[in-house]
């Protein structure tokens, strides 16, 4: 069903579009619900290319995001730096919003400005529950970004080796990550773990057949 079929404007009044984005920033659900049936366009963008849902997602305004998503906001609409509500929620560990985007058509193959899926920054930033959620959703485990790194490599190279990163490495291995997929310089996940003294991660990789 299109937005026009729902009674939402196809282009929108600029003043009301601005008001909708402001309401999203303030987590003002009542105002969002007041604006949408009138002349606000749900996916109208500001100068940064951000929709109201993108703004709500950045602020982790769960109620505003829910109202917008339920009204048909595009969870894959990218801003000027190639972030979408889905990708941003995954990268930042905004789990509740991420789950809503997954339930409303998130494009699992979409990538950010670094050519990475949502799983890669989630792993790099230590968001354990987010990694679990994205794996369960079916995001490609061994996707390689523009830097030549996978989620497994980023969890090791850019993490600190503590418990949350140990858990993420375990989750990725259990999901079938290629433990021998090296970076562009030919350095393997095992070599990166050894170089950083991450013994627990090293042992997990060895147990999974890393070389």
Model feature map: region roles:
Residues 180-211:
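Leucine-rich solenoid repeat scaffolds
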Residues 10-55:
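N-terminal segments that cap or nucleate solenoid repeat domains
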Residues 28-36, 61-69, 94-102, 127-135, ...:
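Ankyrin repeat structural motif
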Residues 4-5:
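C-terminal motif of bacterial Sec signal peptides marking the signal peptidase cleavage site
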Residues 22-27, 55-61, 88-94, 121-127, ...:
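Ankyrin repeat A-helix N-terminal signature
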